[in-house]
């Protein structure tokens, strides 16, 4: 019963965070599909007019949300965004969103001067699973972009609420055997299909 109440409170918090007034300035390079979005935003002109972030940051965060929690609720998507941003703020990880998402071993193809992740040698499995990392156009991608955009704006405005309470790690709750690192960190929350853990130093 207590877990159910905590989950409901987490979901309500996520919805409250994502419906706070904001602007929509997603780059023209990102394609939206004209489908009904499950999240309705209340817009307020110039609310975040001084907040800036790059299109690359937006795409990296949206891709991480899409592949890690695309089928989950708004709370599940926001939780992945929180962990990504928490890692960026931690001295234990790269200090950029894309650096965090793409952290891991790479090889350099000198013929075309491009780096590729080594199979199963990265932090987020979708990035190095050998599959094409191209999202399918539709509602799931659109909402992932929307959550990423709002999370970035509120992060840089220092008003983003962290529903994972500082977590830097998570794993699926359906795993029969948890990763070894899970026993060395503090469990902070269970949101949708992931269990979240906290550790590390912060900048």
Locate each region found by the language model.
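Hydrophobic membrane-insertion alpha-helices, especially the h-region
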Residues: 6-20
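Bacterial extracytoplasmic/cell-wall-associated proteins, especially those involved in peptidoglycan
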Residues: 2, 25-203
């Amino acid at each position: 019963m207590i877990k159910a109440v905590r989950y409901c409170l987490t979901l309500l918090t996520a919805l409250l965070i994502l419906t706070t007034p904001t602007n929509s300035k997603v780059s023209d390079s990102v394609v939206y599909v004209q489908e009904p979005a499950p999240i309705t935003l209340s817009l307020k002109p110039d609310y975040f007019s001084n907040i800036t972030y790059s299109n690359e940051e937006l795409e990296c965060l949206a891709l991480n949300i899409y592949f890690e929690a695309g089928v989950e609720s708004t709370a599940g998507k926001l939780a992945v965004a929180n962990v990504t941003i928490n890692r960026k703020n931690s001295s234990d990880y790269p200090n950029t969103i894309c650096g965090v998402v793409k952290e891991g071993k790479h090889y350099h193809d000198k013929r075309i001067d491009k780096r590729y992740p080594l199979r199963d040698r990265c932090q987020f499995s979708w990035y190095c699973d050998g599959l094409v990392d191209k999202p399918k156009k539709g509602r799931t991608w659109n909402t992932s972009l929307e959550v990423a955009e709002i999370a970035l704006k509120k992060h840089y405005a220092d008003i983003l609420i962290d529903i994972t309470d500082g977590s830097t790690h998570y794993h699926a709750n359906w795993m029969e055997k948890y990763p070894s690192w899970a026993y060395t960190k503090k469990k902070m929350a269970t949101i949708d299909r992931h269990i979240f853990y906290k550790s590390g130093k912060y900048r």
